[in-house]
Amino acid sequence: MQLLVLQGPNLNMLGQREPTIYGSTSLADIHNAMREKATSAGIELSFIQSNHEGVLVDTLHAHYGKIQGIIINPGALTHYGLSLRDGLALMDVPIIEVHLSNVYAREAFRHHSVVAAIAQGQISGLGWQGYLYALDWFIQRKSA
């Protein structure tokens, strides 16, 4: 099983950016924890982080027909990234949307996700471990 892990704008600054909201774990540390768990389950992960929506869409197009699922934290693109949402929709694979903070307990503009309606599920507010929970879902799906 091959999964694509997409990280949106500003996630490259995890560990430094507002640690009281997003925690002190770096993106590299999150990816390393995911890679370790995935490897033991026989799952291959490809990671991409970009601050540019078009790069994320191009990445989806490059992986079309080559992956079995997507784990995505769209960052601020969650709320208005329509080209990203459309790119995700054309992939025809399960998508799990992850957010480090509980977006529904924050500012009202963060409560709407353009991705949620096309995602299999959403994990919000469980910190960096939310990525591992998303990966667990794919591991269980692979085993079924």
From Swiss-Prot:
Pathway(s) per entry: Metabolic intermediate biosynthesis; chorismate biosynthesis; chorismate from D-erythrose 4-phosphate and phosphoenolpyruvate: step 3/7
InterPro entries according to UniProt: DHquinase_II (IPR001874), DHquinase_II_CS (IPR018509), DHquinase_II_sf (IPR036441)
Residues the record marks as site: Transition state stabilizer: 17
Enzyme Commission number: 4.2.1.10
Catalytic function, reaction form: 3-dehydroquinate = 3-dehydroshikimate + H2O
PANTHER family in the record: CATABOLIC 3-DEHYDROQUINASE
Entry function: Catalyzes a trans-dehydration via an enolate intermediate.
Name of this chain's protein: 3-dehydroquinate dehydratase
Organism: Herpetosiphon aurantiacus (strain ATCC 23779 / DSM 785 / 114-95)
Name of the gene encoding the protein in the UniProt record: aroQ
